[in-house]
């Protein structure tokens, strides 16, 4: 899976091509320890936890939950992939056992809870008998959603307020630290590690050097659930969290089309990178972690774990759509969709052409047009994510409109809360670009939204 030839070709070059990511060598990668996946248990919000639950957890023996040697049928591989999807990467960074049992924490951060009282974005894990850990960093944290009726939809664009909680955690640390200067230095260093592009002048993250903890926390807290920032993006250019339902049909991964998905192996490589292997990346002379750590002290998913996870993601199906496609308004909207030429980019049946469009300010290299499938026309949206992040290819991919009824917020940065707002010309002062549909009559606008919500 992790071989040099495929790694060299599955990503598009960055805008500054010489700064494109160089990933860990196969020799280094396969010396990383395989990440153990332990059996995990649900977390209940205050008022919903069964009596004696924590004492019961403390009596459980550690147990591994993934064993590739037992997997034979398609159903077994897919079920094992769901276990990987649920499994945390780390412990203590985002959650603590006390925090996830604190009513004030839920209220302050507006953490969604399922109808049966679970906080489903993390899990309790027993790695040592008698010690109950709260795991974080699983796929669940970003790619799962508590629906309005309290059901839980795995694979969907998430609605866990992860960045709001990062801001809250920063404020909590600042309130109790005995060394405010050291804390601030560490937080600023973390932002540079996650986001810096020192080959650009000025570095997009340079302003962090003069920001306070309060100011940094405020930026995180302003990022809405459904959007997030993570390694290689930018504190100042978050990205909409992608819906993974239907990912098997997408030619490009990431909003900037960074990764070509030619097979399940490309999806496996992509998951490996975003779930830890990006720590070993080099961008020109810039290393995220310098010096590169001893691989035997770090970990990775096994190829079998990645394959199972890929199979699970490919198996995901959308929930039943409550919006009737034959309703009069939706039928009118279908005609508006066709008349306005929306299907040129959002082409049925996937409602995406699976192509890329250049951002403002990016000149498409001649060899890209045929190699990658480019619509050589900018739609004028904010170019920051495409030009000034470590995922910046100069492009945005054409998103699929399937499943928008259960998703949101919209736009590549999650800057628009609803479809109604997207088609409201008043948004242009705050969210530029993609002017299509902004001159429709109110009736046509309502019809178009009604149709899109049936997809």
Identify the residue ranges that each predicted region occupies.
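Periplasmic c-type cytochrome electron-transfer domains
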Residues: 1-455
């Amino acid at each position: 899976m992790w071989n040099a030839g495929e790694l060299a070709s599955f990503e598009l070059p960055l805008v500054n091509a010489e700064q494109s990511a160089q990933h860990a060598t196969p020799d280094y990668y396969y010396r990383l320890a395989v990440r153990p996946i332990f059996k995990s248990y649900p977390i209940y919000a205050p008022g919903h936890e069964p009596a004696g639950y924590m004492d019961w957890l403390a009596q459980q023996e550690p147990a591994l939950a993934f064993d590739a040697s037992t997997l034979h049928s398609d159903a077994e591989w897919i079920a094992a992939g769901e276990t990987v999807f649920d499994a945390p990467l780390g412990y203590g960074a985002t959650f603590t056992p006390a925090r996830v049992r604190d009513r004030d924490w839920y209220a302050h951060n507006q953490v969604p809870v399922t109808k049966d009282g679970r906080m489903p974005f993390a899990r309790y894990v027993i790695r040592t008998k008698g010690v109950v850990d709260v795991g974080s960093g699983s796929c669940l944290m970003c790619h799962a959603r508590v629906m309005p009726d309290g059901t839980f939809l795995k694979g969907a664009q998430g609605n866990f307020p992860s960045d709001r909680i990062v801001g809250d955690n920063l404020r909590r640390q600042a309130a109790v630290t005995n060394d405010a200067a050291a804390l601030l230095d560490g937080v600023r260093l973390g932002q540079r590690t996650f986001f810096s592009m020192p080959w650009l002048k000025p570095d997009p993250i340079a302003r962090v050097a003069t920001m306070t903890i309060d100011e940094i926390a405020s930026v995180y807290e302003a990022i809405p659930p459904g959007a997030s920032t993570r390694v290689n993006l930018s504190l100042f250019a978050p990205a909409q969290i992608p819906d993974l339902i239907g990912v098997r049909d997408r030619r490009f991964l990431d909003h900037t089309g960074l990764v070509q998905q030619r097979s399940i192996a490309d999806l496996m490589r992509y998951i490996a990178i975003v779930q830890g292997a990006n720590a070993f990346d080099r961008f020109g002379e810039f290393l995220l972690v310098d010096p590169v750590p001893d691989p035997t002290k770090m970990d990775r998913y096994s190829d079998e774990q990645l394959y199972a996870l890929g199979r699970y993601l490919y198996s995901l199906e959308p929930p039943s759509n409550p919006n009737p496609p034959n309703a009069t308004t939706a039928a009118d909207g279908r005609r508006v969709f066709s008349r306005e030429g929306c299907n040129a980019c959002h082409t049925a049946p996937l409602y995406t052409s699976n192509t890329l469009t250049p951002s403002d300010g990016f000149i498409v290299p001649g060899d890209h047009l045929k190699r990658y499938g480019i619509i050589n026309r900018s739609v004028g949206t904010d170019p920051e994510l495409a030009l000034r992040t470590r995922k910046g290819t100069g492009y945005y991919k054409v998103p699929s409109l399937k499943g928008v009824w259960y998703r949101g917020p919209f736009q590549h940065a999650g800057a628009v809360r609803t479809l109604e707002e997207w088609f409201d010309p008043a948004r242009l002062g705050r969210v530029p670009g993609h002017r299509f549909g902004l001159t429709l009559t109110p009736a046509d606008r309502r019809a178009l939204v009604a149709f899109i919500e049936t997809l």
